[in-house]
UniProtKB/Swiss-Prot annotation:
Lineage: Bacteria, Bacillati, Cyanobacteriota, Cyanophyceae, Synechococcales
Name assigned to this protein: Serine acetyltransferase, plasmid
Superkingdom of the organism of origin: Bacteria
Principal subcellular localization: cytoplasm
Pathway it works in: Amino-acid biosynthesis; L-cysteine biosynthesis; L-cysteine from L-serine: step 1/2
Enzyme Commission (EC) number: 2.3.1.30
Catalyzed reactions per annotation: L-serine + acetyl-CoA = O-acetyl-L-serine + CoA
GO terms assigned for molecular function: serine O-acetyltransferase activity; structural constituent of carboxysome shell
Matches recorded under InterPro entries: Hexapep, LbH_SAT, Ser_AcTrfase_N_sf, Serine_acetyltransferase, Trimer_LpxA-like_sf
NCBIfam families given in the database record: EPS_EpsC
Encoding gene, per UniProt annotation: srpH
The species this protein was found in: Synechococcus elongatus (strain ATCC 33912 / PCC 7942 / FACHB-805) (Anacystis nidulans R2)
Length: 319
């Protein structure tokens, strides 16, 4: 029996009954959601694979000695950063252009010609690049917080290479800037790349201050409208989630409302704690392990399981 490729593709297709299957799949691939069908033309969507490459390129620019060329020297660092950043921003510009085109198709903005979209993509790419020095400053404070806050940490290199919380906050700070620039899909893909790598789920909309430290990290969830101050430390399996979801007169969820906790400066939240709703945890407070909290607490509070009373729970907890 010959194993060589067969040239008669029609015969192969018929042997598996593929004609009807391919036709059905081709029709289904246009997308069943009505608001996605504003154009009869196919358009390139953002690529998760490409964005993963972009993120790791950006990380090598932010921490070149650890994630850049292993042969990097003091003399070649400047060139490496410039060259890598140029290549990475070109890739990002294309992904931004694709999201803008998707927004145009789904929202029907009439003025969005290809030339206009390309110009807008370039402007957003430039704005993102301008934010990188501030992102680097914040990340340096995060790394320092991890080193000072974990007695097991032996070096900065160990933290950068081995701490999932640092990987998560690195990608989050990049995702948050994309979110601020009106690129929610790229931001969300970035967050999911981070989630897949670290087990830490931070929505790109969450606003997080400097010197932030997630220790261990597995199972941490931080919701879209969370506001977290400076020098906050949280441990594994902490949830900063929503308590309930308001609906409009048609029964549809009302999106975009503030529904997640506000964590003020210098707060520590220990493993397994669940904080739900638009509550405020006052500055310098400590939330003990496995606490279930649905009410605000003043500055300087120490909340343990023994102090928590039974609170009414509404649907959607922890999301």
């Amino acid at each position: 029996m010959s194993l060589s490729p067969r040239s008669d593709r029609t015969e192969i297709r018929r042997s598996w009954g593929l004609d009807s299957i391919v036709s059905a799949l081709s029709q289904a691939s246009t997308d069943p959601l009505p608001h996605h069908l504003l154009s009869d033309q196919f358009y390139p969507l953002p690529s998760r694979e490409s964005l993963g490459l972009i993120l790791h390129g950006l990380r090598s620019v932010l921490f070149p000695r650890h994630f850049g060329d292993p042969e990097l020297s003091v003399e070649t660092t400047h060139y490496f950063i410039g060259n890598t950043l140029d290549k990475t921003l070109n890739l990002l510009n294309e992904q931004i252009r694709r999201e803008l085109w998707l927004q145009h198709v789904t929202q029907g903005t009439p003025e969005a010609t290809p030339a206009v979209l390309s110009q807008h993509a370039s402007e957003l790419t430039q704005a993102f690049a301008q934010a990188l020095p501030e992102i680097k400053r914040l990340l340096d404070s995060d790394v320092n917080a991890a080193y000072l806050g974990d007695p097991a940490a032996q070096s900065i290199s160990e933290i950068l290479f081995c701490y999932p919380g640092i990987t998560a906050i690195t990608f989050h700070r990049l995702a948050h800037r994309l979110y601020q620039l009106g690129l929610p899909l790229l931001a969300r893909i970035t967050a999911e790349v981070s989630h897949s790598e670290t087990g830490i789920d931070i929505h790109p909309g969450a606003a997080i201050g400097g010197s932030f430290f997630i220790d261990h990290g597995t199972g941490v969830v931080i919701g879209e409208t969370c506001v977290i101050g400076d020098r906050v430390r949280i441990y594994q399996a902490v949830t900063l989630g929503a308590k309930s979801f308001p609906r409009d007169e048609t029964g549809a969820l009302i999106k975009g409302q503030a529904r997640h906790p506000v964590i003020e400066d210098d707060v520590v939240i220990y493993a397994g704690a669940t904080l739900l709703g638009r509550i405020t945890v006052g500055r310098g407070s400590t939330i003990g392990g496995n606490v279930w909290l649905t009410r605000s607490v003043p500055a300087g509070s120490f909340i343990s399981q023994a102090q928590i009373r039974s609170d009414n729970f509404e649907s959607g907890g922890g999301i």
